[in-house]
From Swiss-Prot:
Disulfide bonds: none annotated. It comes from Salmonella typhimurium (strain LT2 / SGSC1412 / ATCC 700720). Belongs to the GreA/GreB family. GO terms for molecular function: DNA binding; RNA polymerase binding. GO terms for biological process: DNA-templated transcription elongation; regulation of DNA-templated transcription elongation. Transmembrane segments: none annotated. This is Transcription elongation factor GreA. The keyword Transmembrane helix does not apply. Necessary for efficient RNA polymerase transcription elongation past template-encoded arresting sites. The arresting sites in DNA have the property of trapping a certain fraction of elongating RNA polymerases that pass through, resulting in locked ternary complexes. Cleavage of the nascent transcript by cleavage factors such as GreA or GreB allows the resumption of elongation from the new 3'terminus. GreA releases sequences of 2 to 3 nucleotides. Pfam families: GreA_GreB, GreA_GreB_N. Keywords: DNA-binding, Transcription, Transcription regulation. InterPro entries: GreA/GreB_C_sf, TF_GreA/GreB_CS, Tscrpt_elong_fac_GreA, Tscrpt_elong_fac_GreA/B, Tscrpt_elong_fac_GreA/B_C, Tscrpt_elong_fac_GreA/B_fam, Tscrpt_elong_fac_GreA/B_N, Tscrpt_elong_fac_GreA/B_N_sf.
């Protein structure tokens, strides 16, 4: 399986979710299944079937997280030599030359991406266009809404 790039924060969030699923959610579901079994006939027991469905989702998510963590390539951008280039994990401030709007993004792994928090996936059109660029570079990025021209104002390794 291919290495999955993620930041330290992203790996920690996945570990926290895994711990929660294993230590809290899994026991809750097991208890719900046991309680539903006590109600008798399992064929027409909606509580039992709902709990079993939850168990399937929970176990699937646990396996998914474990696979991602085992294949994770955790990158601590603060330990990278700062050569001023946009790399995975970097925080980049850009100026949209069409709208004069300034925006700051952090380039993260797919699981960490949250556009509302300005965390963009390394595989997004914006990140792909910015990777390798330096401060003062101008780049045209093809987005679903059309071509957008950005100027890189600042590159930080936070």
């Amino acid at each position: 399986m291919q290495a999955i790039p993620m930041t330290l924060r992203g790996a920690e969030k996945l570990r926290e979710e895994l711990d929660f699923l294993k230590s809290v959610r899994r026991p809750e579901i097991i208890a719900a299944i046991a309680e539903a079994r006590e109600h008798g006939d399992l064929k027409e027991n909606a509580e039992y079937h709902a709990a079993r469905e939850q168990q399937g989702f929970c176990e699937g998510r646990i396996k998914d997280i474990e696979a991602k963590l085992s294949n994770a390539q955790v990158i601590d951008v603060t330990k990278m030599p700062n050569n001023g280039r946009v790399i995975f994990g970097a925080t980049v401030t850009v100026l949209n030359l069409d709208t004069d709007e300034e925006q700051t993004y952090r380039i993260v792994g797919d699981d960490e991406a949250d556009f509302k928090q300005n965390l963009i996936s390394v595989n997004s059109p914006i990140a792909r266009g910015l990777i390798g660029k330096e401060q003062d570079d101008v780049v045209v990025i093809k987005t679903p809404g059309g071509d957008v021209e950005y100027e890189v104002l600042k590159v930080e390794y936070l």
